[in-house]
């Protein structure tokens, strides 16, 4: 389908997305019950395989074309000193991605995934959201389109990640708008700020919510008013994957904030997504609880870039390898239990 050009079109397209293939899911469940193992012996791997099979429309699927997308954006609010690093680090890290020197490059290679980085108007940061909306509707839709169009329609698994100095503050503001509570509930150390830095981030989140009241009543306005271009691009990619029935592994706090916008806008929008890991950012667990998702890994990561999601590709690969590659009792000539 064509790329949406307005927030209304975007929400309408997401709401019209179809669910998983019930026949494939049922076939996968039936096959799982016939494999040479005691019932439930592979634990969560069995659930993952059945979930994946339903979304791919194949009771005996394979993972052959995983894709990792990293989006980069700069934030006007970074000028307020919310990060331990200056904004120019975003540009420098994009160059590092391009030369294969970042963690996500290594983890994507290890997982057998294609990986690409997409910088979005780095020379023009979003507006400081304590002074008004971070983006116009045209601006947020342009960023959503970057993510939407970056998805390879032949991919069979998607991980999205980000780079953007100041984006934990933006993600905290979005999460606070979506789920309420105090700003302190949603702010954390990000790139490593101290207690004074966390307090500053909380104050800035509060200011942003006060200046942009529409963010508290409309999830897509929360993305526009408080988010960044890389958050919008991740939302666009995850939404397009939903329409294409490409399963998604979510990364950490910032990725999950972008994804949560979709679920709050359209219930069920994240049924095709699982949580790859639980971030060391203290608010990530709270957001996953709201989304009803349990992370596959708990490794204390807080890097971003899609790193935890890329690591989790191997877990899902293992689930699918067992499901599709194991023999049934009949095939193996083994007596069933």
Swiss-Prot record:
Short name of any one Pfam family annotated for the protein: DBI_PRT
Reactions catalysed, as given in the entry: 5,6-dimethylbenzimidazole + nicotinate beta-D-ribonucleotide = alpha-ribazole 5'-phosphate + nicotinate + H(+)
One record GO biological process: cobalamin biosynthetic process
Residues the record marks as active site: 305 (proton acceptor)
Coiled-coil positions: none
Pathway the protein contributes to: Nucleoside biosynthesis; alpha-ribazole biosynthesis; alpha-ribazole from 5,6-dimethylbenzimidazole: step 1/2
Keywords, in A-Z order: Cobalamin biosynthesis, Glycosyltransferase, Transferase
Entry annotated with the keyword ATP-binding: no
Superkingdom of the source species: Bacteria
An MF annotation (GO) of this entry: nicotinate-nucleotide-dimethylbenzimidazole phosphoribosyltransferase activity
InterPro entries in the cross-refs: Nict_dMeBzImd_PRibTrfase, Nict_dMeBzImd_PRibTrfase_bact, Nict_dMeBzImd_PRibTrfase_N, Nict_dMeBzImd_PRibTrfase_sf
EC number of the protein: 2.4.2.21
Main function: Catalyzes the synthesis of alpha-ribazole-5'-phosphate from nicotinate mononucleotide (NAMN) and 5,6-dimethylbenzimidazole (DMB).
Family designation: Belongs to the CobT family.
Protein name per Swiss-Prot or TrEMBL: Nicotinate-nucleotide--dimethylbenzimidazole phosphoribosyltransferase
